[in-house]
């Protein structure tokens, strides 16, 4: 009779091992028999403040890309204590509205979004043309992952956000004798992504930027759909975005 091998992941011994690893990395114990809670890292989608200007919204043009899974080393609950992390969940809570020039255009607008996994980052954030075949740069809905890079880039999630513009700047007061039609020109986007399972291997460095990632980067790609005809063809349609993100992750492996 073949004896079944004991699965340490579901045994008391396995729980004890996980408890020891958790205490060694964080200095805190958790009850044996319970899973270690996910760590949480929060950051804002905004331009950083300087000595002369406050923080502000970021701009989404016909093609914008940001790294999402930035986690610096350390012993805090929002840091990585080892060289491998697993990102399980991510929230995205932002507000979007047309830029000042874009608000002068009358019509509907759309922002296309992608969460893209990069299996083999090169130390710099790639261009959108490295990820997608961009036959029509103005219209993100036509983009597909480049055939030559399908083994490197994987689209984890894809979605869109719509808003409108009446030709009047956002928040403009009513002028005497002029009527402005109310439109949905300030919109919210609230997303919660589960089962991402983005495994990242980090270099032995002191930061958590793209240059520190050996394997497994995650990017937020965005495209404001441009106008196909009319006066707006000469205008670079821009969407402003501001908000926050939370990463829910665990550290894995040895010190």
From Swiss-Prot:
GO cellular component entries: host cell; host cell nucleus; T=1 icosahedral viral capsid
Localization terms from the record: Virion; Host nucleus
Example of a GO biological process term: symbiont entry into host cell
Signal peptide range in chain numbering: none
Main location as per UniProt: virion
UniProt keyword list: Capsid protein, DNA-binding, Host nucleus, T=1 icosahedral capsid protein, Viral penetration into host nucleus, Virion, Virus entry into host cell
InterPro entries in alphabetical order: Gemcoat_MSV, GV_A/BR1_coat, Viral_coat
Task of the protein: Encapsidates the viral genome into characteristic twinned ('geminate') particles. Binds the genomic viral ssDNA and shuttles it into and out of the cell nucleus. Plays a role in protection of the genome from degradation, virus acquisition and transmission by insect vectors, infectivity, and systemic movement. The CP of monopartite geminiviruses is absolutely essential for virus movement.
Quaternary assembly: Homomultimer. Interacts with the movement protein. Binds to single-stranded and double-stranded viral DNA.
Assigned protein family: Belongs to the geminiviridae capsid protein family.
Protein name: Capsid protein
């Amino acid at each position: 009779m073949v004896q079944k091998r004991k699965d340490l992941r579901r045994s008391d011994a396995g729980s004890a091992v996980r408890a020891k690893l958790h205490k060694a990395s964080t200095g805190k114990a958790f009850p044996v028999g319970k899973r270690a809670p996910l760590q949480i890292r929060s950051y804002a989608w905004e331009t950083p403040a300087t000595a002369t200007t406050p923080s502000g919204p970021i701009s989404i043009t016909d093609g914008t890309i940001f790294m999402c899974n930035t986690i610096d080393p350390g012993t805090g609950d929002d840091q990585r204590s080892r060289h491998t992390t697993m990102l399980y969940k991510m929230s995205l809570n932002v507000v979007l509205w047309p830029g000042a020039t874009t608000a002068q255009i009358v019509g509907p607008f759309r922002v296309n979004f992608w969460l893209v996994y990069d299996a083999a980052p090169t130390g710099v954030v790639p261009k959108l043309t490295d990820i997608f075949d961009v036959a029509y740069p103005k219209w993100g809905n036509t983009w597909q992952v480049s055939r030559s890079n399908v083994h490197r880039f994987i689209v984890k999630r894809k979605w869109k956000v719509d808003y409108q513009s009446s030709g009047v700047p956002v928040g403009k007061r009513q002028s005497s004798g002029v009527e402005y039609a109310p439109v949905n020109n300030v919109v919210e986007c609230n997303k919660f992504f589960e089962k991402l399972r983005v495994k990242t291997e980090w270099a032995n460095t002191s930061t958590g930027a793209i240059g520190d990632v050996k394997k497994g980067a995650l990017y937020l790609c965005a495209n404001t759909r441009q106008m196909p005809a009319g006066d707006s063809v000469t205008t670079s349609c821009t969407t402003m975005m501001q908000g926050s993100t939370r990463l829910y992750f665990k550290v894995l492996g040895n010190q």
